[in-house]
């Protein structure tokens, strides 16, 4: 898989589950901070299929394709899952396919007498939401740093694997 297919790869430590209010049965709103980049992530997970736990760590991968060596078909087709050997899904426990629907500006944060302008990316996985926050803005593109190749309405895959607790 070419490196440009891997949009984001990080370890997430879950800090809260359903912190505000439980709205839907069989859905958990999981919130946490990534270990290396210290980004804030909030995501909805189907808890019937893949329950997550506070204090546990999970490997997250956002990818443009589930295939190691070729691009995923642009439109959902039967062929997408008819030959699923040697895919990224082989190494993960939970996979969702969704669309980027929003880039937004976060509230300004104070850091050492200066304000930091941060951004968020929101992705919808069939109504289950995923948001990465506290991203720094790229001065050239105006998009979040490290996510310059992401566009609105782009299809992305979220792959998750539990790695501790």
Stretches found by the model and what they are:
Residues 1-99, 104-119, 125-165:
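Mixed-charge, low-complexity intrinsically disordered regions
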